[in-house]
Amino acid sequence: MRLNRLFSVAMLSIIFGGTASAQQPYGGCWHPEHVKNWSPETDKNAKFNRSKVPLAKRFKEPTLMKANKNQFYEGQVCNATILFPTCSSCPSQGANNFLGYQPTYWQYMDKLVYWAGSASEGIIIPPPAPSTDAAHQSGVKSLGQIFFPPYAFGGNQAWVREMLTKENGSYIFAKKLYEIAKYMGFDGWFINQESGGSTLSEWAGFIKEFNALADADGNSHMEIQWYNASGSPSPTILKSHKNTSQFLEYGANGDYRGQASQLGCT
């Protein structure tokens, strides 16, 4: 009798354990074809992936507390970090394990980028909602990832061309990416373009359209950060919008203050 009870309990655990696993909501990890017609009504996990904490005003210490005369508030720190090892299995609202990573040094950064995505899993990845909540409490922007990998890592120029699709003169994915960011409560996107197959002027137009939608909708804080493995600033990209930033290639260094007017900076 006892053996039968143990067997029954084991079977119930397997059945309901599988059901619980099937019901676990996950964060977005998409290819372009899955984003084109995205809406919260058709995405069963959308409501679990929303940040509800507004972006706080960033604290600035008094001038007298500056470390030296060359320290300026205009200089910002962006933390591009792996918040979860695989974007396709990132839980929407935390988990009972230590796989996820949550920064605790918010005072030392101004922007958080979810470093994620792969050719096999997905290349369009919104940041985890709990990470955005935590970032916003400290006035830190939270950016999702759009990753066009190099050919050696499965890069496909067809994804680039699809992302830059125009209909009636408008970049349809710029609009959709804005809708996703607005609904999920984060602050824009990091575009990692290492697949080729496009021009800087095309992406500048894409960025302009994204920010025009955000500005018109009262979300003028939103931004796109650009990376294409270049070690030099791109005037074409940086002049797209006042919020646009660029991640220079690793190891790049130099003083670009003399190019401020060319880069649309003040």
Region spans (language model):
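Intrinsically disordered low-complexity regions specifically enriched for long asparagine
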Residues: 17-19, 252
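Bacterial N-terminal signal peptides that target proteins for export
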Residues: 1-8
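Basic/polar N-terminal segments that are highly enriched at the extreme N-terminus
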Residues: 1, 19-22
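Bacterial N-terminal signal peptides
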Residues: 8-17
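Compositionally biased, low-complexity repeat tracts
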Residues: 13-14, 23-24, 184
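Chitinase-like catalytic core of GlcNAc-active glycosidases
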Residues: 70-263
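Glycine-rich, aromatic-lined ligand/substrate-binding cores of catalytic
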Residues: 266
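N-terminal module-boundary/linker segments of secreted carbohydrate-active enzymes
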Residues: 22-96, 100-102, 106, 216
